[in-house]
């Protein structure tokens, strides 16, 4: 069987179409023949289904500039798991943007109109642009060519934690605001702050206090500007991003609390009825600028930690002014 490499495709004839496309979903039909992407041809060489391409065996072809060993590791892994898949090329799949492979449900192929996963591939020493995530599976290939799959999804964050709070007064002390005589609803129903003791006083974080003052539910000397200024003194621009995300979470009916012990900005509760009958938090939220680039190792660590404590990792991507927030959930996936 004669196969030749022409540019970025491997040309194969009608016999190859019958053997590889019709029965196993390799390649793209072209005038009765098929074109193979180099990674597909490399897999056929690896399996021994073809002997050579332009005189190159599997070892020679994989070592050439025609095919990426990182792409091959993912392609082979997904084929080993029983999936048919197509390289995401213009004219080969309906929507090629934002993916490297389009993976079909088991038992389906490129002739069906079903897609299981859109896969984007990176090596462990590459970086992933935060805004590129969502609506795809990130396949990370480590130095031993093992593949970790991370499902990324853009979603809305919402809940029913919207208890009303009567206005109260507080005192700005260092990096906290203390409400000495707060209404019971502040902590018990709306889950703001932490109680200092049995006397009923509640201490608020700066981000909680800034939100409450801006919403007119808390008064402090100097007003909201004093709290925000203090927040910027201790956190810089990060405080404004965290405040924007905190505000958006509260507006969506979600009660955020510090996520420090989990290495996150917030942990969130979607359905708070009272502080005494509190369920488990559902999300860990990290606040990041929209132009953030993830190191795969850090991303895998965040997701692994969230999974270990039965939560979902969500990244809140903020613009400079915090006017727009995109929520990207990332979870481990076993295809």
UniProtKB/Swiss-Prot annotation:
Enzyme class, broadest EC rank: lyase
MF terms (GO), sorted A to Z: lyase activity; nucleic acid binding; tRNA-intron endonuclease activity
Keyword Phosphoprotein: no
CDD domains, per database record: tRNA-intron_lyase_C
UniProt-listed Enzyme Commission number(s): 4.6.1.16
InterPro entries the record matches: tRNA_endonuc-like_dom_sf, tRNA_intron_Endo_cat-like_sf, tRNA_intron_Endonuc_cat-like, tRNA_intron_Endonuc_N, tRNA_intron_Endonuc_N_sf, tRNA_splic, tRNA_splic_arch_long
Catalytic function, reaction form: pretRNA = a 3'-half-tRNA molecule with a 5'-OH end + a 5'-half-tRNA molecule with a 2',3'-cyclic phosphate end + an intron with a 2',3'-cyclic phosphate and a 5'-hydroxyl terminus
Alphabetical UniProt keywords: Lyase, tRNA processing
UniProt-listed GO biological process terms: tRNA-type intron splice site recognition and cleavage
Keyword Signal (UniProt): no
Catalytic residue positions: 269, 280, 311
Family according to the record: Belongs to the tRNA-intron endonuclease family. Archaeal long subfamily.
Annotated NCBIfam families: endA, PRK09300.1-1
Reported function: Endonuclease that removes tRNA introns. Cleaves pre-tRNA at the 5'- and 3'-splice sites to release the intron. The products are an intron and two tRNA half-molecules bearing 2',3' cyclic phosphate and 5'-OH termini. Recognizes a pseudosymmetric substrate in which 2 bulged loops of 3 bases are separated by a stem of 4 bp.
Subunit architecture: Homodimer.
Name the record gives this protein: tRNA-splicing endonuclease
């Amino acid at each position: 069987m004669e196969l030749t490499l022409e540019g970025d495709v491997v040309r194969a004839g009608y016999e190859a179409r019958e053997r590889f496309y019709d029965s196993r979903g390799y390649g793209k039909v072209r005038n009765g023949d098929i074109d193979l992407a180099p990674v597909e041809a490399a897999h056929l060489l690896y399996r021994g289904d073809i002997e050579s391409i332009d005189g190159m065996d599997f070892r020679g072809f994989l070592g050439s500039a025609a095919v990426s060993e990182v792409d091959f590791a993912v392609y082979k892994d997904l084929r080993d798991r029983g999936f048919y898949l197509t390289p995401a090329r213009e004219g080969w799949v309906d929507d090629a943007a934002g993916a490297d492979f389009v993976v079909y449900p088991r038992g389906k192929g490129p002739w069906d109109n079903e897609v299981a996963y859109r896969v984007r591939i990176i090596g462990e020493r590459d970086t992933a642009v935060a805004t590129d995530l969502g609506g795809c599976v990130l396949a990370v290939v480590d130095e031993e060519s093992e593949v970790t799959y991370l499902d990324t999804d853009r979603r809305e964050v919402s809940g029913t934690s919207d208890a009303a709070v009567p206005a109260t007064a507080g005192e700005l002390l260092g990096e906290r605001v203390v409400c000495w005589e707060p209404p019971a609803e502040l902590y018990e129903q709306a889950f703001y702050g932490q109680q200092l003791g049995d006397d009923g006083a509640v201490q608020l974080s700066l981000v909680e206090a800034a939100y409450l003052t801006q919403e007119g539910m808390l008064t402090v000397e100097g007003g909201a500007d004093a709290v925000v200024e203090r927040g910027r003194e201790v956190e810089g621009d990060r405080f404004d991003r965290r405040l924007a995300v905190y505000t958006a979470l509260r507006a969506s009916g979600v009660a955020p609390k510090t996520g420090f012990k989990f290495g996150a900005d917030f942990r969130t509760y979607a359905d708070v009825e009272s502080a005494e009958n509190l369920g488990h938090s559902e999300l860990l939220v990290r606040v990041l600028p929209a132009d953030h680039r993830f190191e795969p190792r850090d991303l895998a660590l965040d997701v692994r930690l969230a999974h270990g404590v039965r939560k979902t990792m969500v990244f809140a991507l903020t613009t400079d002014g915090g006017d727009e927030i995109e929520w990207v959930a990332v979870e481990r996936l076993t295809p």
